[in-house]
Amino acid sequence: MSMENRRGRPPTRRQHLFTKDLKSLMYAFGDDVNPAPDSINVLEEIVVDYINEMCLEAARIAGNRNKVKVDDFKFALRDDPKKLGRVEELLVLQKMIADTRNVMKYNKDHF
């Protein structure tokens, strides 16, 4: 009997990368302080599957290029304006943080 999950891929070893974050999110959305481990595991599987699918789609879009770029992810999200908008917002915030750090470093070095 084959050991494949519902997506036709072999199951991956769980590393519980998002357990702490998922517990916090679940609590923030009204779950118990200590949610059921099965619930966390299911959500983690969904998150990991989504990330894998997005990375595969971005790599497909990148085609023969050696590197996947942010624009490949943005293109993959083009049909989901809410997610695309959030990506754009996070990119702007990332630039603002980097600029602020540069200013602070400059001020520290020159004053």
From Swiss-Prot:
SUPFAM superfamilies: Histone-fold. CDD domains: HFD_TAF13. InterPro entries: Histone-fold, TFIID_TAF13. It holds the Pfam family TFIID-18kDa. Transmembrane segments: none annotated. Keywords: Coiled coil, Nucleus, Transcription, Transcription regulation. GO terms for cellular component: chromatin; transcription factor TFIID complex. It is found in: Nucleus. Residues 17-61 form the Histone-fold domain. One of its GO terms (molecular function) is protein heterodimerization activity. One of its GO terms (biological process) is RNA polymerase II preinitiation complex assembly. It comes from the Eukaryota. Functions as a component of the DNA-binding general transcription factor complex TFIID. Binding of TFIID to a promoter (with or without TATA element) is the initial step in pre-initiation complex (PIC) formation. TFIID plays a key role in the regulation of gene expression by RNA polymerase II through different activities such as transcription activator interaction, core promoter recognition and selectivity, TFIIA and TFIIB interaction, chromatin modification (histone acetylation by TAF1), facilitation of DNA opening and initiation of transcription. Belongs to the TAF13 family. This is Transcription initiation factor TFIID subunit 13. It comes from Schizosaccharomyces pombe (strain 972 / ATCC 24843) (Fission yeast). The gene is taf13.
